[in-house]
Amino acid sequence: SYAQKNHFANLRRYSKENAALPQATKKDKRVIFMGNSITEGWVRTHPDFFKSNGYIGRGISGQTSYQFLLRFREDVINLSPALVVINAGTNDVAENTQTYNEDYTFGNIVSMAELAKANKIKVILTSVLPAAAFKWRMEIKDVPQKIKSLNDRIEAYAKANKIPFVNYYKAMVVDENQ
């Protein structure tokens, strides 16, 4: 139906794939990658890497941390993974769903980490990838500074809570202002 296809969090996006997964056992080392178009594209361009490692991609293009949080139970908790890799924030900064508020975005990321831990799911947090601007939202100002500030908070939270942190930003940035 129209409502299902256009639901804010797109909860049904992976419903068939989720239903087709066998029930996870304690021996399983199921890993879920939760993200946006970056994650979705990675799965699409490297399906063998995901399949051969037992990795499950749950990226939806254009989504923000608000939408990730709404679908976290469906696409992560209910699948009983051993580990979830959370990559969130790019589309928040791009204001894809609302005016950017770093505290809200950071809070959504923390909430996902807390939900995972409460369900005995290990967490890896990642940085937001570098961007100088967003071609679909050129009016957004100070993009590099906003990304760096959010990344600093995610990294500090990860360190304080002994959560592994993968710094994609550091590996990919060409210039701090780009």
What are these regions (language model features)?
Residues 85-89, 106-113, 117-126:
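Conserved, well-ordered alpha-helix/loop/beta-strand core segments that scaffold catalytic motifs
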Residues 37-41, 61-65, 90-94, 129-134, ...:
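Solvent-exposed loop/turn segments at secondary-structure junctions
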Residues 129-178:
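Catalytic His-Asp segment of secreted/periplasmic serine-dependent ester chemistry enzymes
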Residues 34-36, 86, 166:
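Active-site flanking residues adjacent to catalytic metal/cofactor-binding acidic residues
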Residues 57-60, 90-103, 137-143:
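Surface-exposed cleft-lining segments at the edges of enzyme active sites
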